[in-house]
Structures are given as structure tokens and as C-alpha cells.
Amino acid sequence: MNPGDFKDFAKAMTDYITEYLENIRDRQVVPSVKPGYLRPLVPEQAPQQAEPWTAVMADIERVVMSGVTHWQSPRFHAYFPTANSYPSIVADMLSGAIACIGFTWIASPACTELEVVMLDWLGQMLGLPDQFLARSGGEGGGVIQGTASEATFVALLGAKSRMMHRVKEQHPEWTETDILGKLVGYCNQQAHSSVERAGLLGGVKLRSLKPDSKRRLRGDTLREAIDEDIRNGLIPFYVVATLGTTSSCAFDALDEIGDVCNASDIWLHVDAAYAGSAFICPEYRHFMKGVEKADSFNFNPHKWMLVNFDCSAMWLKQPRWIVDAFNVDPLYLKHEQQGSAPDYRHWQIPLGRRFRSLKLWFVLRLYGVENLQKYIRKQIGFAHLFERLLTSDERFELFEEVTMGLVCFRLKGSNEINEELLRRINGRGKIHLVPSKVDDVYFLRLAICSRFTEESDMHVSWEEIKDRLMMFLKSKGAVLIKIICSTTRRTKNILTYIKQNIFRDVGL
């Protein structure tokens, strides 16, 4: 491809992207395809000769878009959001053009240094303590990981490295195997599955502790578990406090947990993957009270802060424990400036890394802090709008207090009736939700996921839910008519059946 073709192709693609995003609400959210749909749409082998770029453009709708789930649609309410914005898309274009692999400072000085500064900018926006920021002149600093799952695992390995070092000093006769068998970490039962996975990958025990009635892990619960394990000869070394659980956006009691961890010198990692973006708004920082007691903190700008995936921001007070855990230093990666600037290969699992800080730089400059704050507040406002619509209908109930851009709700009645309602909602494909279950209670999650969302979209989603419920009730009514027409039993028995099998399911 020559420069002229590149310009033409890029112009056509930017036009296509703009048209796609600005009209995305017109598309069915989830595609009507089955596994294996794509293979028949493309040749069995790669072409021997080059094709024109226009041929590729012509195939995008037929091959790709026919099987895309449209996460940026205002009607997509599943999981948590994945962020998207024009500045971030353009930054990814530049990153792709530079095409550096920034594993050391010398591999691309700008790649490292912009990341250091952007993590300081971002940390200040959140109100993080200076101990986490490189600008403070201390040991602390930030790094961009690929995902919060990586950050959780990296923090666990750092905590493990620190505790192994301490225990070896106290018990030089113990082997690493002896120590590893005694290490134990803790988290909320509602913590993300990646926390459990980090324990498995790290080869250590991880206990999931029961939260209180508001789904929060409390300090007393953690203290009791730690005391019990110490009595049993174990070594507590790591705790994950979740701010905004995946199931219901509950917040652990960070301040209490921090006191317990500090008293026992246990590494405290804060996972604020989704909710952390809201902390750029001062009115939501009460959820992170006690963050100064943490050893590491993580949130995902790529979820809710208009920075495209992947961009997971992590800060550490003492990154040396991470560096020590990952330090493999072959001659071909050494350089004369080692020690003068971070070599981020020591702060992560992979060696290679993209120029991800460009996305932060572009977004923070082209939006500004005030507009990002307005965006977060607007999205939370949409969640409260849906909450009001929901609570105006006596057939529904909230499962969890609405604090961020997530509404957890259910139809009054059995789990089975809610499962059927969700099947009908998602089966039509106009909107898309996912469920969760806490304490054996099944509920639906409606997340505000798109930067294109407006008030009218919330009304559309609410009307679709009510419409699917009405169709479900009509199907129940058809069953009822069939029973009445075919039964020869007494009226009393019919009414009993109706009460037990029809009205009960919908909370009537």
C-alpha cells in the first residue's frame, strides 16, 4: 500500500467509523448468528495476490459487522461499560504508527516518560495520596496494565515477594516451599473472579470472606479470619478490597480493612476497576476513604473514562517489591540509563507493551477534567432515572442501592420468573442485559454503558422491559385459558392453581 492509498483508505475508514458510531442505536445490539457463522463468508485460504483496499471495505459489513455485539450502543446494558471516544481512537492510530515496544526507557523514552506523567495527572484527579505519585519524589508511582486482572495478580506477586523476604529473615531455616504453603490472602465473597484466579496462578491460598447485609467486607470479619489463620500457623500476606463489586457495585469498608491490614503489616490492594472513574468527582470520594492505608490501587479508565481498551491504571507505594519479583535482566535489555527512569518491563507480567499513555494524554487534554466529571455525573443520572421508572412499577423491586451507573433489579417473585424475563428480553435483541445472583437471589443488571446514551434511551429500554413482561404475562394467560377450557375440576381448584402457579410468579 502506497501513501496515497493509505490516505484514501484511512479517510474511508474514519468516515465509516463516524457513521457507525453516530448511528449505532439503529443496529440490533446482539447479532443473530450462530457459532461458526463466519467461516463460510471468507475464502478457505489467504489470497496469493494483493487485493485493493476497497474490497476489504466492502466486506466489513458482510463479514465483521454481521457478527458484532455493539457494546457502544445505548441499548447495550450488560457487564460494565468499555469506554470509547474519538480522541482515544486517534491516539491508538498514532500508537500504531509509532509501533514501539516500550519495555525499557531506552526502547522509547517518550513511551515511558509520558506514562509516568499521565499516571501522576490521573492520580491527582482521583485525589490519591502523594505516596502513590512519582512527582512526590518518593518511591511510589503508577503504571498502565492491560486489565484489572493483571493488576490484581501483579499486586499479589508483590505482596508475596515482600512476605517471603520478611519470613526468610525471621526463619532462615524455612524453605520457599515451607513458606508458600503457609501464605494466605483474603477478599470479599463478591470480589471479581480474577482475585481467585490470581491466587491460583500465584500458588497461594485465598479465602473469600462473607460480607455484611450491604455486601461489604468489614474490618471485624477480616480481623477474625486473620486471627484464626495465625492460630493455625498460617501467614496472612494479602488483602483485596473491592470498591464497586461486579455483581452489584457494593463497596467494601476500605477504612476499616486498611486499619486491620496496617496493624498486621499485610499488603492491601484496592480494586476499583469500574467505580474508580467516579472518584474524579469529589462527591464520590467518600467511597475510597482510607485509601492512604493501601499499598496498591487500581482502576480502569477503559471502562468509564472515555479511554479505549486497554488502559488499566495501577499505583504502588513501593514498586520495588514488584520489580524484585519480576527482575530478569539479560544483557540485551540493559542500558546506560537504568535506575534513572522506570523500566516498565519490571512492573508487569509481559515484556512488551504498547504506547498506551497516548490515549490518556489525548483524552485528558481534549475533554478536560470538568467535561469528564460532567460525563460521569450524567451517566449516574441516567441510572437514577431508570431507578425512578422502575420503582414506579409495583411489580419490580431494587436489589441494591443505586450509587453509580448500575441498576440491580428484579421482578417480584421467584428466581425462575426473572430468568424467563431475561431470556425474553435478550431473545428479542433490542436491548441486552446480564444477570447475577447473590445469596441465591437472581436479579438483572442494567448498566449505563454508552457515551451516546440520552434520556430517551432509558425510556426505550424501560418500555422494552415492560413489553417483554407483558408478552410473558400474556403467555401465562394463554396457559390459564387452556386450563380453564380443558379442566373438569371445580372452580375452587382452578382458582387455587391460578394463585399458586400464575400470580405467585409475578409477585401478585
From Swiss-Prot:
InterPro entries: Aromatic_deC, PyrdxlP-dep_de-COase, PyrdxlP-dep_Trfase, PyrdxlP-dep_Trfase_major, PyrdxlP-dep_Trfase_small, Pyridoxal-P_BS. The modification N6-(pyridoxal phosphate)lysine is found at K303. Keywords: Catecholamine biosynthesis, Decarboxylase, Lyase, Pyridoxal phosphate. Signal peptide: none annotated. SUPFAM superfamilies: PLP-dependent transferases (SSF53383). The keyword Lyase applies. The lineage of its organism: Eukaryota, Metazoa, Ecdysozoa, Arthropoda, Hexapoda. It is an enzyme of class 4 (lyase). GO terms for cellular component: cytoplasm. The gene is Ddc. Its EC number is 4.1.1.28. Belongs to the group II decarboxylase family. Homodimer. Substrate binds at T82, H192. This is Aromatic-L-amino-acid decarboxylase. GO terms for biological process: amino acid metabolic process; carboxylic acid metabolic process; catecholamine biosynthetic process; serotonin biosynthetic process. GO terms for molecular function: 5-hydroxy-L-tryptophan decarboxylase activity; L-dopa decarboxylase activity; pyridoxal phosphate binding. Coiled coil: none annotated. It catalyses: L-dopa + H(+) = dopamine + CO2; 5-hydroxy-L-tryptophan + H(+) = serotonin + CO2. Its cofactor is pyridoxal 5'-phosphate. Pyridoxal 5'-phosphate binds at A148, S149, T246, N300. The keyword Lyase applies.
